């Protein structure tokens, strides 16, 4: 199967990436399912054991490493999950990525602030008995393959001095996207991939999202003169993504 640019494929991402050439994309930005029981359709179980889930992520990121060009970067949006016990997914992924061969380049704290809503999951209310922290942040973990520098023509950089100064800070304050409005259980805001794409790629670069979902990464690529490749196992979400791109 030939994988073409500016296309979203309704297939499993591991199978899709195995059809890609080595060293064929400049940047990967994605947010894998968090394994918290969300309904992604019958094609995917979001409530596996931790071991099964981490094995799935490892297989996915191994293929990401293979298709990423030397000097390319990958940005992974993830959140820690659970209460009993609390599961530090960001820590598991950091260790996993180093073992695969990626170089850690830092992490961005996505401060979701007031947009996360008035959660009442605080454990023991006003008591030291068993209070629970309410996460109002997620992580964007940044890694690179091989060379620290991504080669490109500086004239094809599309980030302003003001934005560069802001985006290189390790805390980003952004609201969340509405699942109801978008039509997907866990969309990230368009601002997230747009910032990453402008910070880490040149105009004309190829960006891969192995968990394309509602197509937000592809829309960001269209807005910013980048090429995209996406995989999405759910046919309804794939059609939603294609419709969003057509409306741009």
Predicted regions and their residues:
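Core catalytic lobe of class I
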Residues: 1-240
């Amino acid at each position: 199967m030939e994988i073409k640019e500016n296309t979203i494929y309704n297939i499993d991402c591991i199978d899709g990436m195995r059809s890609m050439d080595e060293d064929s994309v400049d940047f990967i930005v994605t947010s894998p399912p968090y394994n918290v029981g969300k309904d992604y359709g019958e094609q995917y179980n979001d409530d596996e054991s931790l071991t099964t889930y981490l094995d799935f992520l490892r297989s996915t990121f191994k293929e990401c490493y293979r298709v990423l060009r030397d000097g390319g970067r990958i940005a992974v949006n993830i959140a820690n999950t659970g209460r009993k016990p609390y599961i530090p997914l960001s820590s598991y992924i950091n260790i996993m990525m180093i073992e695969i061969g990626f170089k850690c380049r830092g992490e961005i704290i996505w401060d979701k602030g007031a947009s996360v809503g008035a959660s009442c999951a605080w454990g023991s209310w006003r008591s030291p008995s068993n209070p629970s922290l309410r996460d109002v942040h997620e992580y964007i973990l940044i890694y690179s393959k091989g060379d620290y520098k991504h080669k490109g023509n500086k004239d094809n950089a599309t980030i302003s001095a003001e934005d560069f100064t802001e985006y290189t800070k390790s805390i980003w304050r952004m609201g969340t996207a509405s699942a109801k409005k978008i039509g997907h259980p866990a969309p990230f805001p368009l601002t997230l991939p747009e910032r990453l794409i402008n910070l880490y790629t040149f105009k004309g670069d190829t960006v891969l999202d192995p968990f394309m979902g509602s197509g937000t990464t592809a829309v960001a690529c269209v807005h910013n003169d980048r090429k995209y490749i996406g995989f999405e196992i759910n046919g309804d979400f794939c059609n939603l993504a294609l419709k969003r791109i057509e409306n741009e």
